[in-house]
Amino acid sequence: IQAFVPRMIASGEEGHVINTSSGDGGVSPLPYQSVYASSKAAVSCITECLAAQLQTEQTKLGASIFYPSGGLLDTGIWTTDRNRPSDLAREKPYDPVPTVADFKVAAEAAGMQLDFQDLDELARFCLQGIRDKSFVIMIGIEEAEKTLQQRAGRIGRSELPIDLAEVPQL
């Protein structure tokens, strides 16, 4: 952010910062993905702060948080362990490493019907969100709103915010 936002502001032109997060962390974390969820929660939080700062300083820049959504995304995220240095290996590695198909089966076993989202369609949706000056860009934001309200209620009652009954088991 420090590397490019000051230069964008100095240009005097309109612009937009789009940060990609995940519903896993930005909306409701999966308990077995704590590092990933934590990093995505941080992306969501810093984007919220950045957007507020850009508005407060009356710049010509906006900022949005993009949650790739609308179904399962068949991307390289499912095989990231192949890039992990051996000295940073997981203490309890998955064996075998779950695939996107494995996750879909686990979700369906938990009563969730998941479909795949076309990545080109998702990119068009994201660009439209930027044009519309939406802060949160997410397919199915209404469902996320319900989840966030439920989490807020559990937090307000000093309960665990994660609804374990809704977590797919791998």
Q: What name fits each language-model region?
A:
Residues 9, 18-42, 47-48, 52-56, ...:
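Catalytic loop of short-chain dehydrogenase/reductase
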Residues 3-7:
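A structural motif corresponding to the C-terminal end of an alpha-helix
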Residues 14-20, 61-66:
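Conserved catalytic-site loops of classical short-chain dehydrogenases/reductases
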Residues 53-136:
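SDR active-site lid
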